[in-house]
Swiss-Prot record:
Catalyzes the reversible isomerization-deamination of glucosamine 6-phosphate (GlcN6P) to form fructose 6-phosphate (Fru6P) and ammonium ion. It catalyses: alpha-D-glucosamine 6-phosphate + H2O = beta-D-fructose 6-phosphate + NH4(+). It comes from Pectobacterium carotovorum subsp. carotovorum (strain PC1). InterPro entries: Glc/Gal-6P_isomerase (IPR006148), Glucosamine6P_isomerase (IPR004547), Glucosamine6P_isomerase_CS (IPR018321), NagB/RpiA_transferase-like (IPR037171). This is Glucosamine-6-phosphate deaminase.
Length: 266
């Protein structure tokens, strides 16, 4: 596992965006051989999306031959609802880059048969071989996507019941009213994430410190879903200073020395 200990959330976004752009450009994608990118929503990736849009506008990257798969979507929210992840992705990213609409893949939280929708999504991912890079965030309780504590580490895309803690955390997007936050979501599974060639998780804020500690210094444990990344051959945790508060000083020092070159020129 790589740990990239940066100073601010803005630094995290810039580093993540630069890494994605480097990966896409090195891959040299084409219509016949697209780059497959997994994407999250929420507050964690906002700075990364801003940086990606800026790099695209500067002519440093094209998304014309990039295919995206989003991590999750609420069940029951209309696609055009201001808090649907369809709306979030288009407002914060897709509307500002040159990605073809047909290359965008989002789960349908209003599907009549959610089991069939989840199966379709898994099959669509497999039709491309694999996701080359999956970017994600992490919840206060260590969940990735909507794989809440005690999720199977072999799980695939499915419907999940959201914990009260997650709904309370997400209520900030619904005017602080927990009753407006959906109780269910469709989400890629832990196994789906682990199938990706590379997984990059963005961790920002003091409230994520225990989750980061569990991911880096703890044991693999389904109660801390994020710890599954210890099993991945190419996992990267990109974090700001407040999120490292629960890590040992020597852990942060070790990774800072290892990643000196990669953290330059942000």
């Amino acid at each position: 596992m790589r740990l990239i200990p940066l100073t601010t959330a803005a630094d995290v976004g810039k580093w993540a965006a630069r890494h994605i752009v480097e990966k896409i450009n090195a891959f040299k994608p084409s219509a016949e051989r697209p780059f497959i990118l997994g994407l999250p929503t929420g507050s964690s990736p906002l700075e990364a999306y801003k940086s990606l849009v800026a790099m695209h506008q500067a002519g440093l990257v094209s998304f014309k031959h990039v295919v995206t798969f989003n991590m999750d979507e609420y069940v029951g929210l209309p696609t055009d609802h201001p808090e649907s992840y369809h709306t979030f992705m288009h407002q914060n990213f897709f509307n500002h880059i040159d990605i073809p609409r047909e290359n965008i893949n989002l789960l349908n939280g209003n599907a009549e048969d959610t089991t069939a929708e989840c199966r379709r999504y898994e099959e669509k991912i497999k039709s491309y071989g694999k996701i080359h890079l999956f970017m994600g965030g992490v919840g206060n309780d260590g969940h990735i996507a909507f794989n809440e504590p005690a999720s199977s580490l072999a799980s695939r895309t499915r419907i999940k019941t959201l914990t009260e803690e997650t709904r309370i955390a997400n209520s900030r997007f619904f005017g602080g009213d927990v009753s407006l936050v959906p109780k269910f979501a469709l989400t890629v599974g832990v196994g789906t994430l682990l199938d990706a060639e590379e997984v990059m998780i963005l961790v920002t804020g003091r409230n994520k410190a225990l989750a980061l500690q569990a991911a880096v210094e703890g044991n693999v444990n389904h109660m801390w879903t994020i710890s599954c990344l210890q099993l991945h051959a190419k996992a990267i945790m990109v974090c700001d200073e407040p999120s490292t508060m629960e890590l040992k000083v020597k852990t942060v020092k070790y990774f800072r020395e290892l990643e000196t070159e990669s953290m330059k020129n942000l």
